[in-house]
Amino acid sequence: RFLVISNQEIKEALKPSCWNQPQITDCSHFTVLLSLDERWFESGSSYLEASFARKAGNNPDMQKKVTEVFENFIRTDLRPSVAEWSVMQSYIASANMMTAAASIGIDSCPIEGFNYGEFFDTLKSGIAEFDFEGYNVAYAICFGYRANEQTKKLRMDLSDLVTYVE
């Protein structure tokens, strides 16, 4: 789930829990990525049922197979907890969002490592129109146009990062 926050008062309230990073209030769109907690992935949940129905094209036999494969994955192959896996899934979305923004000239700044408890409490108290039940904060991204030219990034040499196996 994505919360796109342009309300300046809410951004001001969230800023202290993000170590007062100026991007929080300077950006035009502060996007919070919410991950799903374990209850969404319990066998028979309406979320899973709807998801599996979409994947199976509303074919009941195919839906049963998809359900069995996913439940086996949850039981046997999933190394972190379901909640941690859900957070990792949000990183895929965030990478795509940031790449898409860059491709059209919009800057972005990922925000993590903040005080998650304080941040989440502030979100819940400041946004009445969303039911936060069953969600956790995964990550946040500031989107907008930079005011000043960015300093040159220091990158590792490609050979220090990539090993080719032929």
Where are these regions (language model features)?
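Acidic, surface-exposed loops and disordered segments
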Residues: R1-E166
